[in-house]
């Protein structure tokens, strides 16, 4: 018969499954073991974990829990302890952490090696008697699916790993002192694991909670998009393999802080690339990228004195119009104006690892600056290759080339004509006027603050079939062990 623990586990897994079925993420931040170790190591430093180790009350613990658990009643313990003036940890180090998948699914095992040198003073010898102590604290990172709040990650089951304790005398002295040191070490064997559990484990749990809170704050940092901004929120966390995965929703806000669009449900499941020893990966859906591009490239209008700005293009336009209507071409003076209006917002597409931006353009040609009506109006479906690149922690989009995929004659004062006759020159004009302006807006890039916050100087981008992926570009530089 299934026990209550099995029932609780099944309920937790079912709750997590229902949450995931209801909320489809539009972005995912995947953190590999290297990032987890680095962030937790830093939190242990910030929580003064080594100071806690140095303050372990070794002597008191030996009195309270002697070898075998027998109370101190004038036994051998008292005989040993009366020869000790003081006993304390002299130096303490927390060595390189390890993060591995647990035997239980959706859990991570964190191993924290502890390295200490302790010493005691005795009237039997003038020098301090020192011995080396090593042990390993272990804890489990798991998902808390309790009904009291949203699913979150917690660290639990912290204790010293079985059989990891090693105590060794550093320097041999006289026979009597060596025998005393051996008795002290024997008394520490049952005491030290309890000290680590009671004194250090709460610090480890607090450090993990601090790390998790920092990660949640990190993903919520607003991303500036011209006058708008993009914000992410945690939908639910997950543990897969040796990674922590934060599934995110997103929202677009205007300059007043009003939400203009929610992205809590992706149209399709995101393609999740494997980390392959990459410290972190941020996957952002096509829908969110599309909205970000649209926020930067809002509809706008350009009025250009073509003969002054692009004289060669003005000459070619006049020649092309002359093939349609010579009288209309003759009307084009030195103040001829081309008006370009972008309609709505651009459409962003990802197709087999390649990105494209499509936009609707209205183009009008006026014979002079005094003319009130255009010679003709064209509707153009244009597209450009979109290429992402990074500069430090800035993500930048650049539009390469532009093509007029479809041209329609919307209005004409020179009679009906086939607009494809003007396709080459119209594409040239759009490329020369519109593309530099839009790339100028995109050139400032989008700051991705989590890159430096996770310990990297730069990022690199790539595309899957339906998402933009950011990964670190610089080599990983692990922090030094926690020591004092």
From Swiss-Prot:
Name of this protein: BPI fold-containing family B member 1
Glycosylation site positions: 48, 264, 401
Disulfide bonds: 158-201
GO CC term (a single one): extracellular exosome
Domain of life assignment: Eukaryota
PANTHER family: BPI FOLD-CONTAINING FAMILY B MEMBER 1 (PTHR47395:SF1)
CDD domains: BPI1, BPI2
Signal peptide segment: 1-21
Primary localization class, coarse: secreted
Protein's cellular compartments: Secreted
Protein's organism: Homo sapiens
Keyword hit for rRNA-binding: no
Family indicated by similarity: Belongs to the BPI/LBP/Plunc superfamily. Plunc family.
Molecular function as annotated in GO: lipid binding
Gene Ontology BP annotations: innate immune response in mucosa; negative regulation of toll-like receptor 4 signaling pathway
């Amino acid at each position: 018969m299934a026990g209550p623990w099995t029932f609780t586990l099944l309920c937790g897994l079912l709750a997590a499954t229902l949450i995931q079925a209801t909320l489809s993420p539009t972005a995912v931040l995947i953190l590999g073991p290297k990032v987890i170790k680095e962030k937790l190591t830093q939190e242990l430093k910030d929580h003064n974990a080594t100071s806690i180790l140095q303050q372990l009350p070794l002597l008191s613990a030996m009195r309270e829990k002697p070898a075998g658990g027998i109370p101190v009643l004038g036994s051998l313990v008292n005989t040993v302890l009366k020869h000790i003036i003081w006993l304390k940890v002299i130096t303490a180090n927390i060595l390189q952490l390890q993060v591995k998948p647990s035997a239980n699914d959706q859990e991570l095992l964190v191993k924290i090696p502890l390295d200490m040198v302790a010493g005691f003073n005795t009237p039997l010898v003038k020098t301090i008697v020192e011995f080396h102590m090593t042990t390993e604290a272990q804890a489990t990172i798991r998902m808390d699916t309790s009904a009291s709040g949203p699913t979150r990650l917690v660290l639990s089951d912290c204790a010293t790993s079985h059989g990891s304790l090693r105590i060794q005398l550093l320097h041999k002295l006289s026979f009597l002192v060596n025998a005393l040191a051996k008795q002290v070490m024997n008394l520490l064997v049952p005491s030290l694991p309890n000290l680590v559990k009671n004194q250090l484990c709460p610090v480890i749990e607090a450090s993990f909670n601090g790390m998790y809170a920092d990660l949640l704050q990190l993903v919520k940092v607003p991303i500036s998009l011209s006058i708008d901004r993009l914000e992410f929120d945690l939908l639910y966390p997950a543990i897969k393999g040796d990674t922590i995965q934060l599934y995110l929703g997103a929202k677009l806000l205007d300059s007043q802080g009003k939400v203009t669009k929610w992205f809590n449900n992706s149209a399709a499941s995101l393609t999740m690339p494997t980390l392959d020893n990459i410290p972190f990966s941020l996957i952002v859906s096509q829908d969110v990228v599309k909205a970000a591009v649209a926020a930067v490239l809002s509809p706008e209008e350009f009025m250009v004195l073509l003969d002054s700005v692009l004289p060669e293009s003005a000459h070619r336009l006049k020649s092309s119009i002359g093939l349609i209507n010579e009288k209309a071409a003759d009307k084009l003076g030195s103040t001829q104006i081309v008006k370009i209006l972008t309609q709505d917002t651009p459409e962003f597409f990802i197709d087999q690892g390649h990105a494209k931006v499509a936009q609707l353009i209205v183009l009008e040609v006026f014979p002079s600056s005094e003319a009130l009506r255009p010679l003709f109006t064209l509707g153009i479906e244009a597209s450009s290759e979109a290429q992402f690149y990074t500069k430090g922690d800035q993500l930048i989009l650049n539009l390469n080339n532009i093509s007029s995929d479809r041209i329609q004659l919307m209005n004409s004062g020179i009679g009906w004509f086939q607009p494809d006759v003007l396709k080459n020159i119209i594409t040239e004009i759009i490329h020369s006027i519109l593309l530099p302006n839009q790339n100028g807006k995109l050139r400032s890039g989008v700051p991705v603050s989590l890159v430096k916050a996770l310990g990297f100087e730069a990022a690199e981008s790539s595309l899957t079939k339906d998402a933009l992926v950011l990964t670190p570009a610089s080599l990983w530089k692990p922090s030094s062990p926690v020591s004092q």
